[in-house]
Amino acid sequence: MRIEEDLKLGFKDVLIRPKRSTLKSRSDVELERQFTFKHSGQSWSGVPIIAANMDTVGTFSMASALASFDILTAVHKHYSVEEWQAFINNSSADVLKHVMVSTGTSDADFEKTKQILDLNSALNFVCIDVANGYSEHFVQFVAKAREAWPTKTICAGNVVTGEMCEELILSGADIVKVGIGPGSVCTTRVKTGVGYPQLSAVIECADAAHGLGGMIVSDGGCTTPGDVAKAFGGGADFVMLGGMLAGHEESGGRIVEENGEKFMLFYGMSSESAMKRHVGGVAEYRAAEGKTVKLPLRGPVENTARDILGGLRSACTYVGASRLKELTKRTTFIRVQEQENRIFNNL
């Protein structure tokens, strides 16, 4: 046993210090990034935000809506091959290039993903997703996927430390998904005691990944557009959002009614709700590590997308970054004990 004495920080622990700027307007900021990925060799350009691969966020409807903003969607793994075929038949190549095909690590997952990728060559992203990316089995699956799909861009996670980030990149991942426990409907930290404050995880993993020519996506912990800006400021190449995109018309959650008001259910993918829906219940050897919440209906996701992108542009203007790519170079974090004036929050 040992204790690391240095302080680890989450998004709520910091603010971005403003700096002199030559930008005249938020409209001068370029949010689109262009990437060429280490292993696949593929190039992609767009806004590097990803809708999370949760079945109440990462839906086909969400992918279609967010593609118009050049935002990616990691489509959840519970759609059938037939449902994928129907979606592809009704979607343009421009939508498909903003889609990630999500998979687990079982043999059945591998075969199903292979069938989906064979449906259309425009599907260039694979998201290999497990709660604990530290297992040897997971690393071996990433290597197997890289061998099977040498020209596909592979995103794999989740991890929170530099050495595991490096191992996944060396095993074939182009993008490493970073985050254990920060999600809005994740209870891993309270059920297991395991986790890592998200901003510090992003900073550590970005440093490790960029040294090898890899990239990272910050997954979880964002509650506001300001948090998205902090994730990019900390070095994230991509930011994945779940709760911020939940509760919309495109989110796919079940709608319930209470006292005449309608709500949409949103739950973590390790929650009892998710396991009952997809595997028949919580196995006797494990505990649920997610919760279910009822969200007021939030309308079309386009309004939220515009709010997030607007906040991100504004953050860039405050530090003089004319492009999103420059944000991390222009970011100085200050540690704080307050984020906002909350006097009217309960009104």
UniProtKB/Swiss-Prot annotation:
Keyword tags: Metal-binding, NADP, Oxidoreductase, Potassium
> What EC number(s) is this enzyme filed under?
1.7.1.7
Task: State the Gene Ontology terms under molecular function.
Answer: GMP reductase activity; metal ion binding
Q: Which SMART domains match?
A: IMPDH
**Where NADP(+) is bound, by residue?**
108-131, 216-239
Metal-binding keyword on record: yes
Give TM regions.
none
Catalyses which reaction(s)? IMP + NH4(+) + NADP(+) = GMP + NADPH + 2 H(+)
The answer to whether UniProt assigns keyword Ribosomal protein to this entry is no
* Residues forming the catalytic site: 186 (thioimidate intermediate)
The top EC class, named as a word, is oxidoreductase
Residues binding K(+), per UniProt: 181, 183
Q: Quote a single Gene Ontology cellular component term.
A: cytosol
**Taxonomically, which superkingdom?**
Bacteria
Q: Which GO terms describe its biological process?
A: purine nucleotide metabolic process
Q: Which family does it belong to?
A: Belongs to the IMPDH/GMPR family. GuaC type 1 subfamily.
Listed under subunit, the entry gives: Homotetramer.
Q: What is this protein's function?
A: Catalyzes the irreversible NADPH-dependent deamination of GMP to IMP. It functions in the conversion of nucleobase, nucleoside and nucleotide derivatives of G to A nucleotides, and in maintaining the intracellular balance of A and G nucleotides.
| Name of the protein in its database record | GMP reductase
Q: Which gene is this protein's source? A: guaC
